[in-house]
């Protein structure tokens, strides 16, 4: 498995793991409302986990990818399979009316 994250300043982080392993994606910021989802990949667009406020996480038990937990800055994936390859999106909403958005995307390749 290879995970590549390219930050806004073009910093590239590449992480590797093996099939069947557990893996945590970590982001250094801690926004108030977070949504983790898959986009474009083998699993299509599906939400994986939502976090609101302080530690109120909801994991999608019907997702095709195993998610054990998440937080505003982490997504814990479990029992990865080669079919889990794809893009993972971290969306953040903030501002007085929670109408400001920013996001980051990771590409995950499981082998």
Swiss-Prot record:
Q: Name one Pfam family in it.
A: RL11D
Superkingdom assignment: Viruses
InterPro entries for the chain? HHV5_RL5A/RL6 (IPR024349)
In which family does this protein belong, per the annotation? Belongs to the HHV-5 IRL6 protein family.
User: Can you say what this protein is called?
Assistant: Uncharacterized protein IRL6
Q: Which organism is it from?
A: Human cytomegalovirus (strain Merlin) (HHV-5)
């Amino acid at each position: 498995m290879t995970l590549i994250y390219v930050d806004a300043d073009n910093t590239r982080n590449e992480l590797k793991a093996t099939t069947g392993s557990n893996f945590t994606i970590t982001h250094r910021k801690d926004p108030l409302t977070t949504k983790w989802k898959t986009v474009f990949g083998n699993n299509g667009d599906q939400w994986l986990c939502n976090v609101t406020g302080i530690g109120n996480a909801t994991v999608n038990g019907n997702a095709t990818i195993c998610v054990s937990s998440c937080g505003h800055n982490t997504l814990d994936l479990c029992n990865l399979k080669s079919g889990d390859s794809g893009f993972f999106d971290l969306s953040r909403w903030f501002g007085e009316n929670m109408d400001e958005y920013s996001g980051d995307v990771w590409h995950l390749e499981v082998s």
